[in-house]
A protein has these predicted regions:
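Non-catalytic peripheral regions of patatin-like phospholipases
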Residues: 4-161
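Ligand-binding cleft/hinge of the Venus flytrap
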Residues: 1
Length: 161
């Protein structure tokens, strides 16, 4: 950093992967895990141009560690459902997602590399609206039930509802 002279490097999680979710399986933590998506999980249609293809590859790469974590949670939930795992050993997490795929589908990978103040303001406003919408629609589910159907996610069906 030229301003401070510090030589430490910082990399956004998207370059290395999302933080691990398994520490949250511990019974001492609240069961709710709220994921705030910054990349769409799915898109309608097939990318055709080189830019669209590169953007989708970027999204898939960025989401790959999240999807692996969600598959692990799906397995834990299956073990709980079959009474092969108990809460005192590993919690049965409740999964929620806050997303704004409309905005995220409009953005390209380049917009994430060179964010402009106007874009950041737009994303902040969209994020606040998405969080408010999530709480309005699913606030009563917190602490009680999932708002994401992981089985449907991995079967390719509707995931949030």
């Amino acid at each position: 950093d030229p301003a401070t002279g510090k030589l430490d490097a910082f990399w956004d999680g998207g370059f290395t992967g999302n933080p691990a979710l398994f520490p949250f399986y511990q019974p001492r933590f609240p069961r709710d895990i709220v994921i705030v998506n910054i990349n769409p999980l799915m898109r309608d249609g097939v990318p055709k141009t080189p830019v669209e293809i590169a953007d989708r590859v970027n999204e898939i790469s960025f989401n790959s560690s999240l999807m692996a974590q969600l598959r692990a949670i799906n397995f834990v939930k299956k073990l709980h459902q079959e009474d092969r795992l108990h809460d005192r050993v590993m919690a049965n997490p409740l999964i929620h997602m806050i997303l704004d795929d409309t905005l995220m589908n409009d953005l390209t990978a380049r917009s994430k590399m060179m964010p402009a103040p106007g874009l950041l303001a737009r994303m902040k406003e969209a994020g606040q609206a998405a969080a408010d919408g999530f709480l309005d629609e699913h606030g009563d589910a917190l602490g009680d039930r999932d708002t994401v159907d992981l089985r449907a996610l991995f079967a390719g069906s509707e995931v949030v509802g």
